């Protein structure tokens, strides 16, 4: 979109992906580090927006709480399979034995450069950038999912494949948050970097909101774009400076 991305307005509701969006991408998810300055920015933005700031990620809620501790924000984890708003926690897709069946042939590869994250309701399979594992996984995983009970879908992301329940996506997570305070009645703004964020973009746009794509992959539907997570963090800081009262 032509023009300059506006700063955050007080009537917005922010929905933020984590890896590759708020934080620079790393090949091993356990290696990511959340700067204390980012925790402080998110906490202050949440206060300025009346609590209408949520994390929407492929990571589990437990992992997100660990990363951002002691900050405790509204979150949707596992691509929207689970979500928390206040003290209310919803699981939108129960676990299925089919997930273990899908993962079994991946474990059987015994490939040390493949990392399998079984998150309970979903899974992520990470592979090395320079290796041939992607080709093997691209052939194996669709076959494994086809042999399952049809409860899961396969999503390709950066150096990973996500196995996610069919019934969930990040857009539905946005809709769930927007149904109640403090999100209801606000302008939704979804910020992400991958194909798995497209449903979130669509949900925000359908409600008259904004969609912001971060990083080298260009979205087909997000009107706004930021080159890097560093640019996003700088924009959040600039916005916060205008939202907070002068000292």
Where are these regions (language model features)?
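Substrate-recognition "cap/lid" segment bordering the active-site pocket of phosphatases
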Residues: 76-78, 84-101, 155-185
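Substrate-recognition/cap helix-loop segment adjacent to the acidic, metal-dependent catalytic center
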Residues: 59-76, 133-153
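Short, basic/aromatic recognition patches
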Residues: 1-5
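A structural signal for isolated positions on well-ordered beta-strands in alpha/beta enzyme cores
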Residues: 13, 52-54, 74, 153, ...
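Mg2+-dependent phosphoryl-transfer enzymes with acidic/Ser/Thr/Gly-rich catalytic loops
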Residues: 9, 35, 166, 171-247
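Charged, glycine-interspersed solvent-exposed loop segments at helix/strand-loop junctions
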Residues: 114-131, 153-164
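Asp-based phosphoryl-transfer active-site loop
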Residues: 7-28, 55, 174
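Active-site phosphate-binding/coordination module
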Residues: 33-119
């Amino acid at each position: 979109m032509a023009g300059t991305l506006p700063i955050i307005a007080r009537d917005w509701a922010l929905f933020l992906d984590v890896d590759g969006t708020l934080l620079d991408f790393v090949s091993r998810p356990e290696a990511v580090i959340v700067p204390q300055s980012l925790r402080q920015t998110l906490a202050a933005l949440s206060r300025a927006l009346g609590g209408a700031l949520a994390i929407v990620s492929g990571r589990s809620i437990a992992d997100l709480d660990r990363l951002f501790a002691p900050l405790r924000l509204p979150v949707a984890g596992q691509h929207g399979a689970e979500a928390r708003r206040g003290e209310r926690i919803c699981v939108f897709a129960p676990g299925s034995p089919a997930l273990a069946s899908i993962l079994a042939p991946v474990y059987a590869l015994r490939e040390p450069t493949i990392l399998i994250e079984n998150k309970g309701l979903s899974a992520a399979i990470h592979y090395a950038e320079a290796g041939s594992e992607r080709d093997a996984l691209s052939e194996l995983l669709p076959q494994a999912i086809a042999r399952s009970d049809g409860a899961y879908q396969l999503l390709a992301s950066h150096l990973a494949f996500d196995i996610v329940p069919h019934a969930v996506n990040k857009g539905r997570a946005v809709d769930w948050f927007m149904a109640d305070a403090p999100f209801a009645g606000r302008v939704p703004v979804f910020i992400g970097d991958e194909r798995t964020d497209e449903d979130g973009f669509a949900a925000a746009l359908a409600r008259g909101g904004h969609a912001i794509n971060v990083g080298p992959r260009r979205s087909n539907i997000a009107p706004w774009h930021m080159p890097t997570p560093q640019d996003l963090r700088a924009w959040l800081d600039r916005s916060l400076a205008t939202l907070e009262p002068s000292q």
